[in-house]
């Protein structure tokens, strides 16, 4: 009954405990060794600087070894993002309950913690926190930190949000262009439209050409023409 009461109290207050207890704060001496690796980057060591991108989720894969003479129960995880140079806490991660996972003396256990990244781009020291129940007390197990740099993701031109913005801008410019053409451009182009040049008709062949003569006789007085014909006859 006592152990059940402890667990109930822990599940109700673990978030508050992790919020008020800084990473460098009170820790309990316990022969319960916890280490971890980044599941997505298993080659990383404590001496390396991890590179993470906002929006992704990293998974801490813990390995816990119980060197106590009594069983130890893993009951929760939390953590903080700390400023590496000053030690100031920048982000407190939401505490989460686990199990409970009972680890017998001399045995080990593997468990995981998912951490969605949504922090300001910067340099951090990630300090995970594991909470256990031992000897009817809740204890905070000391765990190493991991240096990391968090950056914003690269924006692709095929990003749905960017595509939507591009379509909105395109529609806006198209509407503006149509408005300018309708209220100003159309009148301008009408006023400066080129005037087609008039084509002169070619003169019809003269009667002189039709009759085989080199000139037009229509304008010559009839008396003069008769006189010319009389001379030719003579």
UniProtKB/Swiss-Prot annotation:
Predominant location: endoplasmic reticulum
Regions of this protein lying in the Lumenal compartment: 20-162
A cellular-component GO term for this protein: endoplasmic reticulum membrane
Cytoplasmic side stretches: 184-234
Key word Transmembrane helix present: yes
Transmembrane segments: 163-183
Keyword annotations from UniProtKB, A to Z: Endoplasmic reticulum, Membrane, Signal, Transmembrane, Transmembrane helix
Signal peptide: 1-19
Keyword Transmembrane among UniProt keywords: yes
Compartment(s) of residence: Endoplasmic reticulum membrane
Cross-referenced Pfam families: TRAP_alpha (PF03896)
Membrane topology: Single-pass type I membrane protein
Protein family membership: Belongs to the IRC22 family.
Protein role: Is probably involved in a pathway contributing to genomic integrity.
The protein's name: Increased recombination centers protein 22
Organism: Scheffersomyces stipitis (strain ATCC 58785 / CBS 6054 / NBRC 10063 / NRRL Y-11545)
């Amino acid at each position: 009954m006592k152990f059940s009461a402890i667990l109930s109290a822990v599940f109700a207050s673990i978030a508050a405990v992790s919020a008020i207890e800084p990473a460098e704060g009170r820790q309990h001496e316990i022969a319960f060794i916890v280490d971890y690796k980044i599941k997505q980057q298993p080659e990383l060591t404590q001496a390396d600087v991890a590179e993470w991108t906002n929006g992704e989720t990293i998974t801490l894969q813990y390995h816990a070894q119980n060197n106590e003479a009594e069983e130890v129960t893993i009951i929760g995880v939390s953590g903080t993002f700390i400023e590496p140079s000053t030690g100031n806490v920048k982000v407190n991660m939401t505490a989460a309950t686990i199990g409970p996972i009972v680890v017998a003396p001399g045995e080990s256990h593997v468990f995981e913690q998912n951490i969605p990244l949504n922090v300001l781009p910067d340099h951090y020291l990630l300090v995970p926190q594991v909470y256990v129940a031992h000897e009817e007390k809740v204890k905070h197990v000391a765990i190493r930190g991991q240096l990391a740099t968090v950056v914003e993701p690269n924006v692709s031109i095929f990003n749905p949000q960017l595509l939507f913005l591009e379509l909105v801008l395109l529609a806006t410019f198209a509407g503006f262009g149509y408005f300018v053409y309708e209220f100003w451009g159309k009148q301008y182009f009408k006023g400066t439209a080129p005037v087609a040049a008039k084509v002169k008709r070619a003169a019809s062949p003269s009667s002189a050409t039709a009759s085989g003569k080199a000139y037009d006789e229509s304008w010559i007085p009839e008396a003069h023409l008769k006189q010319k014909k009389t001379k030719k006859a003579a």
